């Protein structure tokens, strides 16, 4: 009895040394050499008789908690963009986006939403899974994109890829946003048709004096007053086909889009 216990201890110790040196296969080879066909005692003790050194889900790549809780790169870019000087904005945003994409680069292929939503997720998916950029290249690719387009100056679809938005499209979008945001400032006056009162005389006109026909006094035209110099003539929205240029150019959304157009 003591001899069996002693042999078992020696085998366990040899298995531990073999596994530490050669891995799990070394322990199995030692058992076969010693004639222990029952398998590796250490394997049965640790519950690894199925041949897997780790549980099935442990080796999978998981997103760290600090990345799951952090805002997306799109949110970071759009938040910092209004705070920067327009002349240096794209360059600073390029560095910022490149660093944030590099932190998430290993997980973007499976989780493009880490980059953002809409065209940002599309760009991450396109660069990772279609263009097959390596994780260490994604930061530079996104940085070059933001340097030339800004946070919103690009479009993306999985067929045509990532493309820069044309400047004319940005200008038209700015005008559309400005028109949607401005309030109507001209009251509409309903037009009524003036009808001459007619008397019910059975369809007969009253007799008139043929010798002295009535005459209607003609209004005398008033002379046009000259406009004094230095006085600005203010145009109404109706004079510009319903487009209030003053409100449009004073709209912050239009000014931001116009600055992006000039910077690109």
Swiss-Prot record:
Region (Disordered): 182-247
Tissue: Component of the acid-insoluble and acid-soluble organic matrix of calcified layers of the shell (at protein level).
Tagged with keyword Acyltransferase: no
Subcellular location as annotated: Secreted
Compositional bias (Low complexity): 190-213
Range of residues in the leader sequence: 1-21
Biased composition (Pro residues): 214-226
Organism superkingdom: Eukaryota
Positions with biased composition (Polar residues): 230-247
Glycosylated residues (UniProt): 209
Coiled-coil annotated spans: none
GO cellular component terms listed in the entry, alphabetical order: extracellular region
Keywords: Glycoprotein, Secreted, Signal
Protein name per Swiss-Prot or TrEMBL: Uncharacterized shell protein 13
